[in-house]
Amino acid sequence: MKKQRIAVKIGSSSLADSHGGISKEQLSDHVAALARLKEEGHEVLLITSGAVAAGFSALGYPSRPVTIKGKQAAAAVGQSLLMQAYTEEFRKYGIVTAQLLLTRSDFSRKEQYSNAYATLGELLNRSALPIINENDSISLEELTFGDNDMLSALVSGLVSADMLMIFTDVNGLYDQNPQKNADAKKYHFLPEVTEEIASLAGDAGSKLGTGGMKSKIDAAKTALSLGVSVFIGTGCGQEKFLDVMKGKGDGTYIGNAPQKVIKMNKQWIALHSLVSGQIEVDAGAATAIIQHGKSLLPAGVTSVSGFFQVDEVVEVITQQGRVIGKGQCTYSAEELRNLKGMQSQDIQARGERHNYEVIHRDHWVSF
């Protein structure tokens, strides 16, 4: 089996004991299986939940707190306990671990996003095992990643992982709720996530987690769009992750391999960037961008909305108001208003800078 880059997401329900604390047995089982992946030469990233589950009992909560401040306080206590437990277990296998705590803002700000990309790449090159969690204790929004399901999809895309394994307490996707319907049919393989498949998932997670099957399907759809194939399921024993790679996993495989890899910069534009303005283009420019993969030139711009600066992200719309994509603009809004509709030679004749496209195709994403 060739060397692959594997992202594994382990949810709270797969880590916690019956009282809500961290189960040493379950954690040890996961670590042993992750160590086997490393032993076989694969690069491994772990996206783990469990900080709230690990910390709430230490603060005297009888069960998982439901308020934001309660969750964040429990996460502040539990994250160190969770990381300590992982570090001690991985040390038995001679594996160096690294902790990364991320928030939504780390993805929306390009410099931080690029830094996360560089750091993860260096850790993997140095054979360390990154352990990633949302920085729950300081997040401004209420644990928005959905038990880290979406976080795992975004991270797996960021590092161009070959596969994302989402491990949970359910062995895959079914056409009905298997707990309520004995005749429920399990999907062993899905080429893609359709609207029909997405509609089958419920919203609720377990008492120990925040993400139900819906968040996992949403994460799978995002991962596929970033070129990462997905497995959703369960398992036990040190061979469970290797079994998934061999096609013997107890769950659902999603996506045909190999997937098309999306460059880091385009991932950021498509999924994380904040739109600062809008550019309207004529029919010829729209066709050139969408059908022929060309860059957008000033001649094709018909109007400019907003007050964006150089290199900020803008939406591009047709004259009928349809959004066709977005990209990083090499002009400020003020500059572009003065140059819209002009041919390159006319811009050059005016002494304006003329060797920049409005949006280069390498910094453009079509919708």
UniProtKB/Swiss-Prot annotation:
EC number(s) recorded for this UniProt protein: 2.7.2.11
Cross-referenced CDD domains: AAK_G5K_ProB, PUA_G5K
Protein origin, superkingdom: Bacteria
EC top class named in words: transferase
Residues noted as binding ATP in the record, renumbered to the chain: K9, T168, D169, T210, G211, G212, M213, K214, S215, K216
Domain PUA residues, every copy: 276-350
One Pfam family recorded for the sequence: PUA
Residues that, per the record, bind substrate: S49, D136, N148
Keywords: Amino-acid biosynthesis, ATP-binding, Cytoplasm, Kinase, Nucleotide-binding, Proline biosynthesis, Transferase
Cell location: Cytoplasm
Keyword rRNA-binding carried by entry: no
Catalyzed reactions: L-glutamate + ATP = L-glutamyl 5-phosphate + ADP
Swiss-Prot/TrEMBL GO biological process terms: L-proline biosynthetic process
Pathway recorded for this protein: Amino-acid biosynthesis; L-proline biosynthesis; L-glutamate 5-semialdehyde from L-glutamate: step 1/2
Function: Catalyzes the transfer of a phosphate group to glutamate to form L-glutamate 5-phosphate.
PANTHER family: GLUTAMATE 5-KINASE, ISOPENTENYL PHOSPHATE KINASE
Family: Belongs to the glutamate 5-kinase family.
Name by which UniProt lists this protein: Glutamate 5-kinase
Annotated organism of origin: Bacillus mycoides (strain KBAB4)
